[in-house]
């Protein structure tokens, strides 16, 4: 449906309004009030279009129009209303008292819009420019870097999982090999002494500090064993169920979930192993004990052959490994 024009274009005056025309319009509106803009030009004796008369009155001649600079409250209201109505200036002007839609539009384009851009806000969406354009431009400008970074994260995660599984399998082998030997030696000590032994069970990680001190004090009283530093091992605590023959890394899946769990497991496992007199040695003596180092390296050699397809895989002796953190990680990685 086509809207009919408010008046005929023939004989109408266009361009700037004169002072005489303004006085005629003001006098007519004061006598008859606002409205009836289609018939007003003929009644007021004006050679203007009805729409032109309405806009001239609303934007310039209305007596309650507020002139001058916009206050901070008015600017905040304009920003909030623009976020709702967009560029519908007439709808915004109805919410701002004594301000015209044309004046609000001009103030938006010349002042408010520039201030929003300086603050990092998109004047169209009223959202942060960094949240939208910043992140998308970074990914679009460097798509290869972002994809490579994601691939590295996935690879590091997989390496950590493989490292945890291999470490658990290796610790299982060490505990299994030395655990059976300790059981055999402890039983031999029991038979040789012709009686039961006062045992000292290594406390687990769940034991409190008070119990540890009590346990350590009781250790000094158990001196009836011919074992170095008066430390004995409870044979029941090192039964065959303690050390599994299976090198399945899933056996310790819940224990070695992360680095801290691996550390606690290693301490608990080695506390049983190192309780035996053959293994009570300092770091220096361990390095000097070639048979001990040879057996540890042999265990690691067997583990590597089992997990790889090469039967001739060479493993550097453990006492020849660089003792730095990087060297240890490379050796067990």
Curated annotation (Swiss-Prot):
Any one annotated GO CC term: plasmodesma
Quaternary structure and interacting proteins, as annotated: Can form complexes with MYC2, MYC3 or MYC4.
Entries under SUPFAM superfamilies matching the protein: Homeodomain-like
Protein name: Transcription factor MYB122
Limits of the HTH myb-type domain: 9-61, 62-116
Region annotation (Disordered) ranges: 128-166, 198-228
A molecular function GO annotation: DNA-binding transcription factor activity
Annotated gene: MYB122
InterPro entries: Homeodomain-like_sf, Myb_dom, Myb_TF_plants, SANT/Myb
CDD domains for this protein: SANT
Low complexity bias: start-end ranges: 156-166, 204-223
Chain's role: Transcription factor involved in glucosinolates biosynthesis.
DNA-binding residues (ranges): 37-61, 89-112
């Amino acid at each position: 449906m086509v809207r009919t024009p408010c008046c005929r274009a023939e004989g109408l005056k266009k361009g700037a309004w004169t002072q005489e025309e303004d006085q005629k319009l003001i006098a007519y509106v004061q006598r008859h009030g606002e409205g009836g803009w289609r018939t007003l030009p003929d009644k007021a004796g004006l050679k203007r279009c009805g729409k032109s008369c309405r806009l001239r009155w609303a934007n310039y001649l209305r007596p309650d129009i507020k002139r001058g600079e916009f206050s901070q409250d008015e600017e905040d209201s304009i920003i909030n209303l623009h976020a709702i109505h967009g560029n519908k200036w007439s709808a915004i002007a109805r919410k701002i008292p004594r301000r015209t839609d044309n004046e609000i539009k001009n103030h938006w384009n010349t002042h408010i819009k520039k201030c929003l851009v300086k603050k990092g806000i998109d004047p169209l969406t009223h959202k942060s420019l960094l949240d939208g354009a910043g992140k998308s431009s970074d990914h679009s400008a460097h798509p290869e870097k972002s994809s490579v970074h994601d691939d590295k994260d996935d690879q590091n995660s997989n390496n950590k999982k493989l490292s945890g599984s291999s470490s658990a399998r290796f610790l299982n082998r060490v505990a299994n090999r030395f655990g059976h030997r300790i059981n055999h030696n402890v039983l031999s000590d029991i038979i040789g002494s012709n009686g039961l032994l006062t045992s000292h069970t290594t406390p687990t990680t769940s034991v409190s500090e008070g119990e540890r001190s009590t346990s350590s004090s009781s250790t000094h009283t158990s001196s009836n064993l011919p074992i170095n530093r008066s430390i004995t091992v409870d044979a029941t605590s090192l039964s065959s169920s303690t050390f599994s023959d299976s090198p399945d890394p899933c056996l310790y899946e819940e224990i070695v979930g992360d680095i801290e769990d691996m550390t606690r497991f290693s301490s608990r496992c080695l506390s049983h192993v190192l309780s035996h007199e053959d293994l009570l040695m300092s770091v220096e003596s361990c390095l000097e004990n070639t048979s001990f180092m040879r057996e540890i390296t042999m265990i690691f050699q067997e583990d590597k052959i089992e997990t790889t397809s090469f039967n001739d895989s060479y493993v550097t002796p453990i006492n020849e490994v660089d003792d730095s953190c990087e060297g240890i990680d490379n050796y067990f990685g």
